[in-house]
């Protein structure tokens, strides 16, 4: 059975400026869930753990991102096509005068999205959580769920100033993490608040509630 996409669509005008809309996003999330569930079902049938328990979380994020980017292109009515693996940006615009190329960045739970270089451009950031088989989120480190659900999508333009550069010894090479100002510059376009990895008594959760109450 296909998983239902739950969540609130926001900032539709911003999505339209970059060549997308809420229907495209909804269908892309749905296709991503459907494919991930098929992969998990095949793995389990062969006596293998689900994908989220078979690969490291960094690799899982990359896999989900690649699937979601392809799904966005599939449902974009020809406005975008998927770029090759490990190539920037992820989504190539069919008409750059009408709407820009888009880069997709993934992150688990409340982590800030990151890449290897601080490249100015238009971004979609996707943050997800791991839930149990009933779709209930499990955030405890070492006791996370097995099924990925997207809880937040953001969209907007990022400049070099919106990244924090790290090149410390022991790090996984040079990294560029979206900083606080960058997260503010990116506007929420999809929010599944019931699966947000936040304390419902906290300030951040209250800010998300206010965002939902304000509407699109």
Predicted regions mapped to residue ranges:
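Nucleic-acid endonuclease domains
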Residues: 1-89, 106-216
